[in-house]
């Protein structure tokens, strides 16, 4: 669809200097949540009574004692650790989990892990669970431990097909693969094939396990947003005959307590958003403040990161409007004025901007002033410079893309990717998320590491760009829009859309391998820093799995948000 004349109401069009200019409108759907979260008050937060808090602390201590108690059968504790992590409460027991898995690594490194004769090692579930938990913890365990489950032809034994739990554990373990691990690629193909068959054959016989398998095939643990996976797994875990009642009760209480905190944060953010009056001042932009907060929850949900969540959500929201100004509304001439104004970063530049850009520019500057006050009393701190530098570079990248569109330039795939990795905004958003971790974690050394363009961040931007383009390129090409990775790949390699998407997906798979390898010990930066990057990749994997769930937030994304921010768990 070609450019169309803006058809906004006259009252809104008065905000523009040239009301009859032709603009390439995207016609995004309005905010589906309206003022739902504005109704949350501080009194609602107080509904977590003292009795609930006391009960939670008592249960927490009981679980901690389970973790430090001696257990002769280590499989019991392995399953406990796995459940603690999958239920989203491991942040309460980080030291205990670290100590236990280090003990497991040291104790079993020369026995269970490397011996093909150890009888305990013949259990596929145990071996796969051990492998995944240790790799998640940064221990580079060789995938050769799975050789015992392969036949003389280098294929997994067909007898394993009867071990559904073992297959599921191996499937989850295979997603920890790095480069050159053909055995894990074989494991992924083998388990995926047979687990898909299991769902079709036995969904009525064992619906709970079939549901667990179905969820895993769609979103394996390694690529899942922790808070979403916890909500999902809580319903499955309570149906396990061997579930730990103490852990189950604690996890439900913890989920609901955190949900109240998240609702309070979102209410504050929605009030800030309402004061910006986005529907009136920026009617061309995606009104997605609740979705922005959901994105942030994917990056970090733990209570100690409350300030960081509020900062990051606001930056995502401002960056989203900026994206829509460059991508869906601003004329090339207007963008020629906005870009240098952002580079100057000076309130006096407001007078140079078109009327509709003025409130955006002021809001952006005020937001970063607020961030500066939050992270450091010294407004000239390196942390603040990094934050401001990120959005400056993002606007420059957006403008380079606008130049392509203005010239009707069709880049090669390589040329497109060099710029498109910058226009994801992911490097900027990841750096903002770091600021919410605190100076004790994000030191100047970490900021230096960030400035060097580490492979894990590049991998996250690749995942973001390619999954975004695969999901949204058809919608974007309905209007004047720069070519996506799909179109550029099709043109350069003279292939079909389906073939292009298959090849781009392979690059996403390689980016996940880069991500996994960044978690091998010794760590270059603190683990909380690496976890933010991993979680940003997980959010993209969730929101863009089937469609652009940020732009089109009326179906799947709405359900996910409802599960985390509206519906409490029955206790």
UniProtKB/Swiss-Prot annotation:
It is an enzyme of class 4 (lyase). Mg(2+) 3 binds at residue 476. Pathway: Secondary metabolite biosynthesis; terpenoid biosynthesis. This is (+)-gamma-cadinene synthase. One of its GO terms (biological process) is farnesyl diphosphate metabolic process. The keyword Manganese does not apply. It holds the Pfam family Terpene_synth. Its main location: cytoplasm. The Asp-Asp-Xaa-Xaa-Asp/Glu (DDXXD/E) motif is important for the catalytic activity, presumably through binding to Mg(2+). Belongs to the terpene synthase family. Tpsa subfamily. A motif (DDXXD motif) lies at residues 323-327. Transmembrane segments: none annotated. Sesquiterpene synthase producing mainly delta- and gamma-cadinene with traces of several other sesquiterpenoids, including alpha-copaene. Associated with the production of sesquiterpenes responsible for the aroma of the fruit. One of its GO terms (molecular function) is magnesium ion binding. Binds 3 Mg(2+) ions per subunit. Its EC number is 4.2.3.13, 4.2.3.92. Expressed in the rind tissues of ripe fruits. Its cofactor is Mg(2+). Mg(2+) 2 binds at residues 323, 327. It catalyses: (2E,6E)-farnesyl diphosphate = (+)-gamma-cadinene + diphosphate; (2E,6E)-farnesyl diphosphate = (1S,8aR)-delta-cadinene + diphosphate.
């Amino acid at each position: 669809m070609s450019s169309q004349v803006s058809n906004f109401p006259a009252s809104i069009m008065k905000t523009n200097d040239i009301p009859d200019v032709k603009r390439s409108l995207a016609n995004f759907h309005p905010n589906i949540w309206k003022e739902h979260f504005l109704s949350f008050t501080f009194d609602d937060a107080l509904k977590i009574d003292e009795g609930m808090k006391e009960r939670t602390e008592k249960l927490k201590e009981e679980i901690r004692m389970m973790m430090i108690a001696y257990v002769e059968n280590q499989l019991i504790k392995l399953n406990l650790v796995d459940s603690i992590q999958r239920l989203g409460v491991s942040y309460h027991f980080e030291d205990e989990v670290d100590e236990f898995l280090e003990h497991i690594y040291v104790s079993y490194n020369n026995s269970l892990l490397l011996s093909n004769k150890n009888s305990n090692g013949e259990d596929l579930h145990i071996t796969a669970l051990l492998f995944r938990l240790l790799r998640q913890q940064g221990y580079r365990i060789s995938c050769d431990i799975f050789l015992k489950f392969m036949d003389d032809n280098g294929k997994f034994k067909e007898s394993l097909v009867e071990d559904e739990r073992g297959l599921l554990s191996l499937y989850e373990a295979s997603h920890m693969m790095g480069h050159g691990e053909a055995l894990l690629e074989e494991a992924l193909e083998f388990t995926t094939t047979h687990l898909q068959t299991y769902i079709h054959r036995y969904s009525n016989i064992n619906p709970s396990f079939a549901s667990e398998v179905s969820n895993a095939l769609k979103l394996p643990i390694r690529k899942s947003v922790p808070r979403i996976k916890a909500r999902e797994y809580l319903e499955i875990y309570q149906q396990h005959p061997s579930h730990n009642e103490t852990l189950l009760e604690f996890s439900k209480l913890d989920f609901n307590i955190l949900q109240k905190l998240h609702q309070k944060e979102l209410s504050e953010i929605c009030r800030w958003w309402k004061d910006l009056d986005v529907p009136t001042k920026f009617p061309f932009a995606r009104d997605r403040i609740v979705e922005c907060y959901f994105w942030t929850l994917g990056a970090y949900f733990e209570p100690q990161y409350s300030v960081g969540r509020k900062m990051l959500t606001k930056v995502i929201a401002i960056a989203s409007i900026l994206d829509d100004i460059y991508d869906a509304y601003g004329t090339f001439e207007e963008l020629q004025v906005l870009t240098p104004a952002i580079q100057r970063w000076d309130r006096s530049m407001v007078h140079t901007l078109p009327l509709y850009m003025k409130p955006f520019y002021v809001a952006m500057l005020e937001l970063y002033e607020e961030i500066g006050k939050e992270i450091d009393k010294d407004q000239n701190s390196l942390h603040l410079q990094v934050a401001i530098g990120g959005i400056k570079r993002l606007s420059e990248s957006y403008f380079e893309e606008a130049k392509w569109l203005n010239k009707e330039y069709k880049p090669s795939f390589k040329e497109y990717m060099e710029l498109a990795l910058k226009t994801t905004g992911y490097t900027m958003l990841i750096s903002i998320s770091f600021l919410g971790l605190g100076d004790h974690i994000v030191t100047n050394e970490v900021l230096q590491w960030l400035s060097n363009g580490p492979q894990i961040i590049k991998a996250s931007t690749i995942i973001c760009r390619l999954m975004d383009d695969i999901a949204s390129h058809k919608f974007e090409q309905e209007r004047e829009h720069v070519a996506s990775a799909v179109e550029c790949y099709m043109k350069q390699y003279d292939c079909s859309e389906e073939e292009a998407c298959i090849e781009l997906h392979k690059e996403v798979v390689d980016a996940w391998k880069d991500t996994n390898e960044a978690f091998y010990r010794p760590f270059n930066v603190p683990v909380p820093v690496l976890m933010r990057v991993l979680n940003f990749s997980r959010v993209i994997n969730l929101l863009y799995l089937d469609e652009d769930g940020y732009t089109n937030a009326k179906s799947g994304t709405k359900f996910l948000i409802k599960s985390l921010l509206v519906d409490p768990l029955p206790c």
